């Protein structure tokens, strides 16, 4: 059955059974017991509001990857337009460092807000875990802003 979690003025989040959320300084962690990965959500107030949400989502994602010196092919970014938001997502696997890591990073952007969601795990544990995390992000919905 799962549960619905509301972050006031931001989003409704639908967590499947076994998932829990905990707030940290400036972000939220979504975790499931005995899972090899976690989802991190970061909430961002948009400063520049003239760029359409789908284009802004791609810009946020590219800027974040560049700031962290993550080498990525721009054509690997997938875009999605939702009725209430633009979405940009990329998968990145680091297999060169000692601790191999797989990130799936999303930016969901509406007219005034942006959310960065990142699923982080060992690439050996890819599979249904990352699929379930992706479904959580796909079901995330912005609460309509009173500023629109």
Q: Where on the chain are the PLM-derived regions?
A:
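Short glycine-aromatic motifs
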Residues: 2-3, 18-19, 72, 76, ...
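Long, highly charged amphipathic alpha-helices
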Residues: 56-63, 135, 139
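Loop/helix-junction capping segments adjacent to catalytic residues or to phosphate/diphosphate-binding pockets
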Residues: 51, 98, 126-127
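Surface-exposed amphipathic alpha-helical segments
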Residues: 19, 116-148
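Beta-strand-connecting loop/turn residues
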Residues: 24-28, 84, 112-113
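Secretory pathway targeting signatures of secreted, lumenal, and periplasmic proteins
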Residues: 2-59
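Signature of long, low-cysteine stretches enriched in small and polar/charged residues
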Residues: 61-111
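Glycine-rich, often proline-containing surface loops adjacent to acidic residues and nearby aromatics
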Residues: 37-40, 86, 112-118
């Amino acid at each position: 059955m799962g549960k619905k979690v509301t972050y006031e003025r931001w989003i409704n989040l639908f967590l499947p059974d076994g998932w829990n959320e905990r707030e940290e300084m400036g972000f939220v962690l979504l975790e499931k017991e005995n899972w090899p990965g976690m989802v991190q959500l970061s909430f961002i107030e948009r400063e520049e509001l003239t760029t359409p949400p789908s284009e802004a989502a791609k810009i946020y994602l590219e800027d974040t990857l560049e700031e962290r010196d993550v080498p990525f092919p721009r054509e690997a970014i997938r875009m999605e337009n939702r009725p209430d938001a633009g979405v940009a997502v990329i998968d990145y696997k680091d297999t060169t460092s000692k601790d191999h890591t797989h990130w799936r990073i999303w930016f969901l952007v509406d007219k005034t807000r942006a959310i960065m969601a990142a699923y982080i795990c060992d690439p050996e544990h890819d599979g249904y875990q990352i699929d379930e995390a992706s479904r959580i992000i796909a079901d995330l919905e912005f609460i309509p802003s009173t500023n629109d």
